[in-house]
């Protein structure tokens, strides 16, 4: 990654759930590998104020707002306790001497826009995930899926407990399809593999058809071989610059004529980290999270970093 990016810190969002503590541990270790600051945050939504045109209902609204202010005060106090506990988890997951680089903070605002705006100024935002289609907690519910669509930088989604547990030498896996976000994913994946001292598996699944669809094409064997050679050369070209920059990383190239999601899910079962672009072939900046990225995140099989190219437009509330 660029010098500017590697000097930026990491932010982890918490909500007090067990899987958010897992995310804190992962973020603390990643921040330590990068030797950057870690910021533990919880975002508390603001108190709702009376909209215009409610004058005749204002007295009733005042009573509701009083109750909400009391509840909001409780949520703020609870948030401080959650951040304090998460801060302790981060310290325990880090080596001695890191205390000054780990801070905690309660923020006030709409959750997704707040975290998305923070993502402009940090190397990565980290959130926890329960896996198997269930996202944990109020903060980590729709927030995870919304943030990976609106963030201005990488978002790491960490499952509570990858199944089965991965050994320290498990590889990093990256999906490469030629899109701009997969190029950013390659940069992140090489950097992570280098810092972890593990191999990198680069997957290029070059078709959107499944294996059962190909017999209908009636292609000659030489046509298949030529196409496979072309795809292998394409992957080699896209990785060559990164291999020159990270000569310590052993790269295993996997080129298959298949849909990318099933192959990434297969590789994720033995990976310690999967890196994917926020959208792939045919994608464009600002579109919803791609089907491949969504499938890998939802599987909960391994921590996933979703690479997202920064966007200029304001984040919707």
Curated annotation (Swiss-Prot):
The keyword Cell inner membrane does not apply. GO terms for cellular component: peptidoglycan-based cell wall; plasma membrane. CDD domains: USP_Rv2623_repeat1, USP_Rv2623_repeat2. SUPFAM superfamilies: Adenine nucleotide alpha hydrolases-like. Gene3D superfamilies: HUPs. ATP 2 binds at residues 175, 208, 277-283, 291-293. GO terms for molecular function: ATP binding. Disruption phenotype: No visible phenotype under normal or hypoxic and normoxic stationary phase growth, nor in mouse- or human-derived macrophage cell lines. ATP 1 binds at residues 13, 128-134, 142-143. The keyword Nucleotide-binding applies. InterPro entries: Rossmann-like_a/b/a_fold (IPR014729), Universal_stress_UspA (IPR006015), UspA (IPR006016). Induction: A member of the dormancy regulon. Induced in response to reduced oxygen tension (hypoxia), low levels of nitric oxide (NO) and carbon monoxide (CO). It is hoped that this regulon will give insight into the latent, or dormant phase of infection. There is a cross-link at residue 88 (Isoglutamyl lysine isopeptide (Lys-Gln) (interchain with Q-Cter in protein Pup)). It comes from the Bacteria. Keywords: ATP-binding, Isopeptide bond, Nucleotide-binding, Ubl conjugation. Belongs to the universal stress protein A family. PANTHER family: STRESS RESPONSE PROTEIN NHAX (PTHR46268), UNIVERSAL STRESS PROTEIN RV2623 (PTHR46268:SF27). This is Universal stress protein Rv1996. It comes from Mycobacterium tuberculosis (strain ATCC 25618 / H37Rv).
């Amino acid at each position: 990654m660029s010098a500017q990016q590697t000097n930026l810190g990491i932010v982890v969002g918490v909500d007090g759930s067990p899987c958010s503590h897992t995310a804190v541990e992962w973020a603390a270790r990643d921040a330590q590998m990068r030797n950057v600051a870690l910021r533990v945050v919880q975002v508390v939504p603001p108190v709702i104020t009376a909209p215009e045109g409610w004058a005749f209902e204002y007295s009733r609204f005042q009573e509701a707002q009083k109750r909400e202010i009391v509840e909001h005060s409780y949520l703020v106090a609870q948030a401080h306790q959650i951040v304090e506990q998460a801060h302790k988890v981060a310290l325990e997951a880090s080596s001695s001497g890191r205390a000054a680089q780990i801070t905690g903070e309660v923020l006030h605002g709409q959750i997704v826009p707040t975290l998305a705006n923070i993502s402009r100024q940090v190397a990565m935002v980290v959130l926890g995930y329960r896996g198997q289609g269930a996202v944990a907690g109020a903060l980590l519910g729709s927030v995870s899926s919304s943030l990976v669509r609106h963030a201005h930088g990488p978002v790491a989604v960490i499952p509570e407990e990858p199944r089965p547990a991965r050994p320290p030498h498990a590889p990093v896996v990256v999906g490469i399809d030629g899109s701009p976000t997969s190029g950013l994913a390659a940069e992140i994946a090489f950097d992570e593999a280098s810092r972890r001292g593990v191999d990198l598996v680069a997957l290029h699944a070059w078709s959107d058809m499944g294996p059962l669809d190909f017999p209908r094409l009636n292609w000659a064997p030489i046509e298949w071989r030529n196409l496979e050679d072309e795809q292998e050369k394409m992957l080699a070209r896209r990785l060559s610059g990164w291999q020159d920059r990270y000569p310590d990383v052993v790269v295993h190239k996997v080129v298959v004529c298949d849909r990318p999601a099933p192959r990434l899910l297969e590789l994720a079962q033995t990976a310690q980290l999967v890196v994917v672009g926020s959208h792939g072939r045919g994608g464009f900046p600002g579109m919803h999270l791609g089907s491949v990225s969504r499938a890998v995140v939802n599987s909960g099989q391994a921590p996933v970093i979703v690479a997202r190219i920064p966007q200029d437009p304001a984040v919707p509330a």
